[in-house]
Amino acid sequence: MKKIRVIIIASLLLIAIAIAVVCVTRKTTLLDDMLYANEPDIENSITIKAKEIHTYMEENHYGYCTYDNRCNHDGNCGLNATFELSKTGYHNTCCATYVSWVLQEAGYLTKQEHIDNYLNGANNLIRYLTKKGWKEINKKDIQPGDILCYNGHIAIYGGRGRQYDAGSKEYVNKEAPCKISWGMNTEKILRAPDL
């Protein structure tokens, strides 16, 4: 009889903990939604190009591929140095390639910088932008066009708690900007020197 009581009490405690976690998570999501709901829509060259390129990738069914040749579609992998080359070459991207294309189209990077610095890798791109003078900013000061830097991942802040992301085939083919998963915990946020 005591074992049954202990099991019941333990089960009730686990249920209470699960409910508390759901409530806290939901409250955080609601607070984030409320925080960003009044954020002004700011368009700049980065967000304009992020939307334009992401829409093109969605409409043309781009695949996801990483610089180390891992693919999740038909096994043919290739990443182009520029967005224009991707239109007639491989229809693949990864998070860093997408961000690099956006920054090239917005005038912040060149094709040669992309090639010379191997910017198809998120961590390489993050290091290069930092070296190039992009400013690290606090999360509370985030603005559309800022670069969200995670460990091994990179995205573009689109405003109102949303991001332009190409970190998986799902995100390449998902309407953008999509809701940010702050649970990934950005390591840093970078802003272009002139924004």
Model-derived features: positions:
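N-terminal Sec-pathway targeting helices
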Residues: 1-14
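Hydrophobic alpha-helical membrane-insertion segments, chiefly the h-region
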Residues: 15-24
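Aromatic- and glycine-rich peptidoglycan recognition patches
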Residues: 23, 27-38, 48, 59, ...
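N-terminal capping segments
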Residues: 27-112
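Short, basic/aromatic beta-hairpin or loop at an interaction surface
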Residues: 108-129, 156-161
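Structural motif
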Residues: 145-146
